[in-house]
């Protein structure tokens, strides 16, 4: 049976050809290799019709133009040559579109990303809608790749090399107004007149490319170009620490095209695409993409979720304010905040105001839309307005009696169906539900700070939580724009449990004489966004270390922190960035202020700060303990799968994405090699490095956690 076409040609009475893109049975349009013949057949018809005045590409999907190429095509390539051939096929198709003798216009509404933007770049003009759903970008770098269908060559010539490099190197997505300002699109119109605006543009002569800004013209010359690439290269190296080969290849390919012409540029682009597709970094990044897509489809349980019409929040502090923001402004649900203090409510409202006002200032949001979203949030010092809330999120202090009291109050003041979700980071959910009248409706919902930025949430059912409560909480998390993983109700849950030994080891190395900045730099070089000591300062030393005694009580001395170090630091009133002094000292300008290591920290903890270990040795000690604990979490079924374990570590603590998560990293090293490293470290530094039984068994049998495919487990 012949596959239904994703591209349909209709010629209007005014001799404008409309090519409608609608991939059958898919919510998103993605480009697949088999579509090439369909597009070529249409191009042939266009060339044969001498009456045609212009062509318009438009999508039939309600919220996307083309979301990119189908990534599975890359996974199917076994060699760099096969992936290179795929890129050349894409380049050739775009060249044929571009070579049409009549104006070709892309009418863009919704996501226009990757191969979708490359198709739009091959057109002679572009019109997009002013809808917030409309975004344009080349995100291939986030998969360890570069644009392979001409994007590295066409974009710099259209908008200038420095602006194009920023887009391609970061995967940054532009909204309609930004795209118009940069010259990426020729017009921005309301959705209702998109087709007519594109048709009018197609009836004119080919749109002439507008002149580049003076700065971009200077940077396009040999001298300006040399300076630009040197500067951008240094900045990129600092940011990636050399861990992402795609960024180096992007610079090389763009420069080749500008210096030697487009023919050489296209050659370099296809070759680099093929080689990058085979790198372990790209394979790991693609595995994270597939795993996160998979998690987003996971309902959490077999039961249908209950309706979600409104949410209540207990506590207007930093977490409560952040949760209110994502619930109202991302999920679009009415939120009522209860705090014993009116100032707490004001704080939470200001939190959302600050977030939304920032978007208005950056022109990402209209003031009217800001006001509409803010109107969803209200506050109270009692339980008025809570009677019919479907789900209550508790974000009060980490105190068991207080949380149990909150459960009792919610059961007394809310509906019989209301779910109680605790944002605890350390207390067992079973204990919080111990005196509940409806324990099946009590669950953990652990957000990470800052709530609006951190993509992960942990959902923690206790033994008595119902399947419907799990499904409803998962549904809410997804509405809030989060990636949820369901974890077992054991001390530390998953993320904090694997993070604690990593941070403990960093503190232990401090007491042995390693310097703060050396430890942090070693882990940043390894691939973490910040080092462990800085992370502790950012989270708050008091907050970050609160869980250590809980974990030590549950799992024994492998979780013990170096004696008296934490208490010495806290007794010296060091809480980290929030009070201006921790391991680092901070200026007065809030989060943007510069930090420097406080030399007084060394005598305070009885250390010299001399340092004897190399950066790889420092990283090895921290990371191996994290890997070992992650394997224990699989063994104890704290996480439901290694997929969730990899996603949890990458999205929850910034485990290096190019390594694919703890379990993919173990697979890449080999379980046997990880065991050998840990046994060596155990001999040198003590029994906390003893590899767990599961790891030893896997090493002996030569087993791995993942199969070779992107999402299947062994």
UniProtKB/Swiss-Prot annotation:
Main location: cytoplasm
Residue numbers marked as site, Important for catalytic activity: 118, 140
Locations listed in the record: Cytoplasm
One of the protein's GO biological processes: fatty acid beta-oxidation
SUPFAM superfamilies: 6-phosphogluconate dehydrogenase C-terminal domain-like (SSF48179), ClpP/crotonase (SSF52096), NAD(P)-binding Rossmann-fold domains (SSF51735)
Pfam families for the chain: 3HCDH (PF00725), 3HCDH_N (PF02737), ECH_1 (PF00378)
HAMAP family, sorted: FadJ
Subunit annotation: Heterotetramer of two alpha chains (FadJ) and two beta chains (FadI).
Protein name, entry field: Fatty acid oxidation complex subunit alpha
Natural source organism: Shigella flexneri serotype 5b (strain 8401)
Gene: fadJ
